[in-house]
Amino acid sequence: MTNSNRIKLTWISFLSYALTGALVIVTGMVMGNIADYFQLPVSSMSNTFTFLNAGILISIFLNAWLMEIVPLKTQLRFGFILMVLAVAGLMFSHSLALFSAAMFVLGLVSGITMSIGTFLITQLYEGRQRGSRLLFTDSFFSMAGMIFPMVAAFLLARSIEWYWVYACIGLVYLAIFILTFGCEFPALGKHAQHSQAPVVKEKWGIGVLFLAVAALCYILGQLGFISWVPEYAKGLGMSLNDAGALVSDFWMSYMFGMWAFSFILRFFDLQRILTVLAGMAAILMYLFITGTQAHMPWFILTLGFFSSAIYTSIITLGSQQTKVASPKLVNFILTCGTIGTMLTFVVTGPIVAHSGPQAALLTANGLYAVVFVMCFALGFVSRHRQHSSPAAH
């Protein structure tokens, strides 16, 4: 594979995470405007975003098989057509049913693209380089989470309709579409070259279950928290711009944290530092919820930084529970994390309707505490120390 081809594929991976990050994170910023557009209460409007998350979950789950049937390049190009149709549906329809359908399609497209992006990184890079590349790729999710809420606040403050935010997100996919030209993708399925050594099946162990629960609770807690921060902040009397700045601050420090931890993690035992980070994240989230307005930006900045490496560390630890990294095991943990994404508004919507945004934030805090317990319990059963090689550190 040529170096320019590898660079193109790596950028497709980066942008695939940015696309999903933009779609998932911008929800909290535009939810109120979309609720006004359809003349619905915010809590019931949030349920329609479950279609976006369901699309992401279904596509990540199915793409494990779909990648072996439909070439990756074809999937990405077809995804661009679907993206254009979905954004057009948002722009030209006043039907809630069509809005939900468009959200589902956006979820499908971003889920397929993100699973292709993850696969490309694991194919292109080995050992320690793979781990740092995955962290760097994941940082594009956060980068989009920093940029697009600012774009949304800029557009909404100028009374520009909310659907133009999704048109801007569509530009990320346009870049992916352009990159597919003159680019060779790895072959899969029948066309792939199989290694001569047979793969020995290994038992996963209970540690994988702890990690799967941690992945689900972490993503559900994180998105449940960040999706309702704008509404919570507005309820405290903050302006839309200030509320948007809190979300952007979180993802900015999350992004810097990922870059920092891609160097820091190699000097520590992964399970131990993961437990410390999960505990700190739970404490910092509690301080944000109970703190004063003046301290909120500082707490959310430190929360973003210290929680940035948690999810990627969970996935990395999962891959180290077997001697030979199992794609199905990693996919299982990823799927559990994506279930957390799908459940975000299913869980938090009724809580907000009944008790307000602060109750949703406290629920998210409780989920972070569960992540800490799971990571602590993992220390007694994890196999990563016996399976990790010098190349992994």
Swiss-Prot record:
It is a multi-pass membrane protein. It holds the Pfam family MFS_1. GO terms for cellular component: plasma membrane. It comes from the Bacteria. The keyword Glycosyltransferase does not apply. Keywords: Cell inner membrane, Cell membrane, Membrane, Transmembrane, Transmembrane helix. It is found in: Cell inner membrane. GO terms for molecular function: transmembrane transporter activity. The keyword Transmembrane helix applies. Residues 1-10, 72-77, 122-133, 183-205, 266-272, 319-331, 382-393 are cytoplasmic. PANTHER family: L-FUCOSE-PROTON SYMPORTER, PROTEIN TSGA. Belongs to the major facilitator superfamily. TsgA family. This is Protein TsgA. It comes from Salmonella typhi.
